[in-house]
Amino acid sequence: MFSVIVVDDEMMIRTSISAFINNCDVGFEVVGTFRDGSDAIKYLEENNVDLVISDIRMVQVSGIDLAQYIYENKPWT
């Protein structure tokens, strides 16, 4: 099972993507959802995931900034 986190500032989007992934039964499991890149970074500091699905435009930390953090600190994600 591959672990996934979903990062989006809109709850309906997070919920929809998570439900879709979890209901597809294709080997992916959503292990966390976050409304901002800063929340996702806090999670990633303590946990490893296989895939991050992120919005680009978010209030505090954008998806671009999150991608930069992942590139520098978790390149296997």
Predicted regions and their residues:
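His-Asp phosphorelay/catalytic-motif detector in bacterial-type signaling
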Residues: F2, N48-D50, K74-T77
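Active-site T/S-Asp motif of two-component receiver
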Residues: I5, S54-D55
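Conserved acidic carboxylate
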Residues: D8
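Acidic catalytic/metal-coordinating carboxylates
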Residues: D36, V61-L66
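Receiver (REC) domain active-site loop signature in two-component systems and cognate sites
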Residues: M58
